[in-house]
From Swiss-Prot:
Coiled-coil region(s): 451-478
Protein name as annotated: ARF GTPase-activating protein GIT2
Ranges of Basic and acidic residues composition bias in the record: 570-583
Designated gene of the protein: Git2
InterPro entries: Ankyrin_rpt, Ankyrin_rpt-contain_sf, ARFGAP/RecO, ArfGAP_dom, ArfGAP_dom_sf, GIT-like, GIT1/2_CC, GIT1_C
Lineage: Eukaryota, Metazoa, Chordata, Craniata, Vertebrata
Native species: Rattus norvegicus
């Protein structure tokens, strides 16, 4: 989409060669290092886009290149061009300067503080000055002089200024004159294409009256820029505004939208927001989408050895001082959403934005009648309707696209005409509605029967859970008694052998055998390798059907095995490995917040239990203190050189994966993810099994869990046996997010080891 860069293009901030990024609202081209600082400032200061790897509207790119070639950078460095500035000691950054603090301080002073912009003479009333500047902008946009308009905007002119005498805004004037680049600049600074002038006309109306068709179509795209960007982020498609399609509501590829009561309540709360609050939330989500997409481009284009250098990382949205602290905190919490949660939020916002724009009420009973009639006509045409199909599969929702086929539109109009006509109801129409009601009643009865069965199974599982809790308490008491016996018998060495002591763990050592942790919420600690022996199992809970929500269970695994009644710790190594392999193969693939990592077995039982505990804990906060009594935290950390070498190996493999994603080579996902997983395992092996630092443990947990989650996501990219289509775009976004988490964890480990080894 972007034009070929000229050989004499340099970075506007440090004069470095071959800039590959653009600051849209500043009209400048910048290099990678300066771009990292721009991103840390936030979109309210600088809106950065990659020149080659980001889709550009042609006129927007033309506007940026025109401003850059005509010296727009001199607007932001006006006082530096004055020879007197050399005497004052102020100078521009050089390519050889460090990013921190040299380049970062200069860029903040240039764009955030506007320290080098030409200042007008001071006046007593700033509002009068802004009004005069806005009037000048109103007059200047009818010409093609972009630099003058950008200079006025930099001094405080308002892009949405309504001229009291002429009764219009600058965008009305630019549209009437056919100045499409001026319209792009005004839109970047917040001009609204839907504003009406004193005659009740919008800029789109003036563009169409003047015969400026391209400008009119572009103004419509700008008007729907927010929803278009959100839809493109999820499914890689944009609505066809030329043909009247203004919204696309994507659907989850695996139909895994969260249908829990909490999700439904959140959606109702979203729908109850006022238009003003809903607009603020939508803009915040738009900024988060921009941050995530820019992160993906950044990871795909950078030399990944720079991940351990001083370039700035943007893990969440920067603070905007114009917003309240509550809103800034909410904006930053958006970064904590995983790919599935964020996609669900975006879909809800798109659906409600469409409803609000069309003025549709929350109640849709009339639409339901229409949809019943459409279903009846389909039943008569096919005669083979599947009654086992849930209701929501045959009922359309706000996720339907606006463009429908002519045949379906005609059928709907006929149904509406027959339903809303004032004439008598025919026998055929009466029978159709009657059959539809009978089918609905049959489905309702079937669902009630299924609900009763599930309620019975739930009661059975609750009873089994109580039984397991009582057995758990009994085992704890037995372990405590055994510990007391071991302590008493320790004075009689001739009666107690070393092997018997080894077979009697202490009370604290038996704590990892807990079947159910009441304080761990919905993520219990489930050891591996000890409970997966069918000959020693007492009770095994049956799994819920696949359509039952996660809130009904206390664990996400398919079965809940109990512990053996006798503690036989003397199995041979082959039996333990076979048990672990069986458990690994029986674990179902689930969401990545439930993914378990299975480490290699150690030679001793204590080492194996310690590693299983550290890798399988899925609660919040630090790991629970359930390790062996004699386990001592190891303060030793590997050398910085070894960690950097392993990190470079990881980032090299991530770069290959991102290159495959960029070239749509989905069959390369799994080999790349396996190499990344192997590199992560090698890096994790450098660190002690129980690091002393909580930060190291947290980073290692994030590193290994993200690598395992990456393998799971890469498998989804290959076409499987499922009849549901795979949303490759969404899978790719999730793969990139996992790769970013791995890179972030690796950099954290490099930073920690560097700091610890240098101190």
């Amino acid at each position: 989409m972007s034009k070929r860069l000229r050989s004499n293009d340099v970075c506007a901030d440090c004069s470095g060669p071959d800039p590959s990024w653009a600051s849209v609202n500043r009209g400048t081209l910048i290099c990678d290092e300066c771009c990292s600082v721009h991103r840390s400032l936030g979109r309210h200061i600088s809106q950065v886009r990659h020149l080659k790897h980001t889709p550009w509207p042609p006129t927007l790119l033309q506007m940026v290149e025109t401003l850059y070639s005509n010296g727009a950078n001199s607007i932001w460095e006006h006082s530096l061009l004055d020879p007197a500035s050399v005497m004052s000691g102020r100078r521009k950054a050089n390519p050889q300067d460090k990013v921190h603090p040299n380049k970062a301080e200069f860029i903040r002073a240039k764009y955030q503080m506007l320290a080098f912009v030409h200042r007008l003479p001071c006046r007593d009333d700033d509002s009068v000055t802004a009004k005069d500047l806005s009037k000048q902008l109103h007059s200047s946009v009818r010409t093609g002089n972009l630099e003058t308009c950008l200079r006025l905007l930099s001094l405080g002119a308002q892009a949405n200024f309504f001229h009291p005498e002429k009764g219009s805004t600058p965008l009305h004037v630019a549209s009437k004159a056919g100045q499409i680049l001026q319209a792009e600049l005004l839109a970047v600074y917040g001009a609204d294409p839907g504003t009406h002038d004193s005659s009740g006309k919008t800029p789109v109306d003036y563009a169409r009256q003047g015969g400026h068709r391209e400008l009119a179509e572009r103004l419509v795209e700008i008007q729907y820029e927010l929803t278009d960007r959100l839809a493109f982020y999820l499914c890689g498609r944009k609505p066809d505004h030329k043909n009247g399609q203004h919204f696309i509501i994507p659907q989850m590829a695996d139909s895994s939208l969260d249908l829990s009561e909490l999700a439904k309540a959140a959606k109702k709360k979203l729908q109850s927001l006022s238009n003003h609050l809903f607009e603020e939330l939508a803009m915040d989500v738009y900024d988060e989408v921009d941050r995530r997409e820019t992160d993906a481009v950044w990871l795909a284009t950078q030399n990944h050895s720079t991940l351990v250098t001083e370039t700035t990382v943007v893990p969440f949205l920067p603070v905007n001082p114009e917003y309240s602290s509550t809103r800034n905190q909410g904006r930053q919490k958006l970064a904590r959403f995983n790919a599935h949660e964020f996609a669900t939020l975006v879909i809800d916002i798109l659906s409600d934005a469409k409803r609000r724009q069309q003025g549709s009420p929350l109640s849709r009973s009339k639409d339901n009648v229409e949809l019943i009639l459409r279903t009846v006509s389909n039943q008569h045409s096919t005669e083979s309707q599947d009654n086992d199909q849930p209701d929501y599969d045959s009922v359309a929702s706000d996720e339907d696209t606006d463009v429908e086929t002519r045949a379906s539109r005609t059928n709907r109009q006929k149904s509406l005409d027959s339903d809303l006509s004032d004439g008598p109801v025919t026998v055929q129409e009466f029978m159709e509605v009657k059959h539809a009601l009978v089918a609905s009643e049959a489905k309702r009865q079937q669902l009630m029967k299924v609900n009763n069965n599930l309620s019975g199974e739930l009661r059975i599982m609750q009873k089994k859970l109580q039984t397991l809790q009582s057995e758990n308490s009994s085992l704890r008491r037995q372990a405590t008694a055994s510990a007391c016996q071991v302590q008493t018998a320790s004075d009689h060495k001739d009666t107690v052998s070393h092997s018997s002591l080894k077979r009697r763990p202490s009370a604290r050592g038996s704590r990892p055998m807990s079947m159910y942790e009441t304080g761990s919420g919905q993520k219990p600690y489930l050891p591996m390798g000890e409970a997966n022996h069918p000959e020693e199992s007492r009770t095994r809970l049956q799994p819920f059907p696949t359509h039952i929500g996660r809130s009904a269970l206390v664990t996400s695994s398919s079965s809940l095995p109990s512990f053996p009644s006798t503690l036989s710790w003397s199995r041979d190594e082959s039996t333990r490995r076979a048990s672990r392999l069986e458990k690994q193969n029986s674990t179902p693939e689930s969401d990545y917040d439930n993914t378990a990592y299975d480490p290699e077995p150690d030679d001793t039982v204590s080492g194996r239990k310690g590693r299983q505990r550290s890798m399988l804990w899925q609660g919040d906060g630090p790991l629970p203190d359930t390790a062996e009594p004699h386990a001592v935290p190891s303060p030793a950390l590997p050398s910085t050189e070894d960690v950097i070498r392993k990190t470079e190996q990881i980032t090299k493999n991530i770069q290959e994966l991102l290159r495959a994603a960029q070239e749509n080579k989905h069959d390369s996902y799994i080999p790349c993810s396996e190499r990344i997983h192997a590199a992560v395992t090698e890096m994790a092996a450098l660190f002690p099994k129980k690091p002393k630092s909580d930060t190291v443990r947290t980073s290692l947990r994030l590193l290994t869990a993200s690598a395992y989650r990456l393998q799971s996501e890469c498998r989804k990219a290959l076409p499987g046996d499922s009849s549901l289509p795979t949303d490759v775009q969404l899978v790719t976004q999730q793969v990139i997010q996992c790769a970013y988490d791995i890179a972030k964890a690796a950099k954290q480990l490099v930073t920690i080891t560097t700091k610890e080894n240098s101190s």
